[in-house]
Design a protein with these regions (language model features):
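A structural "domain/chain start" motif
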Residues: 33-101
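Solvent-exposed coil/turn segments that connect beta secondary-structure elements
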Residues: 72-74, 88-90, 143-145, 159-165, ...
Length: 208
């Protein structure tokens, strides 16, 4: 019986590996993913807030009411300038010709700061700034910021941790998924921008 179970388990693993290999091969042949050695792209991707404060807009707040926004932590796959493509739970590639102008964590922090500042009319400081001492602290983990090949979708997921000036800690997960996205830089870049703005808006509303 154990031998039969072992054979079934081995067959299942082989089938999963074959499926992942076929999907990766299809994406590679169609020019959707890159495994390294590619030529530099003609343009770079960035994130742009859908709303921004007008020039001359002034805000003020007591130190305990200001918000110190820290750069989010990211997994190794996101600590680069490339857009990850999730083939399955065990396989990862990078999207061809999709390169960020800055690391995703930096871009998302800047987008989030502008959204919170605009939507909540709050003073937002950069985490680590001496002026931010004693302020409310917002940290987080940007766990997903890329393309899911099995769903043909971009996924942005941010786990926020808020430390209030009263010492109370709150946590919340925010996520945006946009399906039906083609696996190319021209489609994935704008879709990630929309999803990132969606998540940033969710966070801003949570903080109100």
């Amino acid at each position: 019986m154990r031998k039969g179970n072992a054979m079934m388990s081995s067959a299942k693993r082989s089938a999963e590996m074959l499926r992942a290999g076929l999907l990766l091969s299809c994406l590679t042949l169609s020019g959707c993913v890159s495994l390294g050695g590619a030529e530099p792209p003609e343009s770079l991707l960035t994130l742009t807030p859908t709303t921004s404060a007008p020039a001359g807009a002034a805000l003020s707040a007591a130190r305990g009411e200001a918000l110190a926004l820290h750069e989010p932590a990211v997994p190794a796959e996101l600590d680069v300038l490339r857009v990850p493509v999730r083939i399955d739970d065990a396989n990862l590639a990078y999207l061809k010709d999709a390169v960020w102008v800055e690391r995703p964590a930096q871009l998302f922090r800047r987008l989030l700061a502008e959204t919170i500042r605009t939507q909540g009319a709050r003073v937002v400081l950069q985490g680590g700034d001496p002026a931010a001492r004693g302020s409310q602290q917002l940290r987080g983990n940007l766990s997903s910021f890329g393309y899911d090949a099995s769903q043909s979708a971009v996924v942005v997921r941010f786990d926020a941790t808020m430390l209030g000036s009263d010492g109370v800690v709150e946590q919340q997960r925010f996520e945006a998924v946009e399906s039906g996205v083609m696996a190319d830089a021209a489609s994935v870049g704008p879709a990630l921008n929309r999803a990132a703005n969606d998540v940033a808006m969710q966070v801003a509303e949570w903080l109100e």
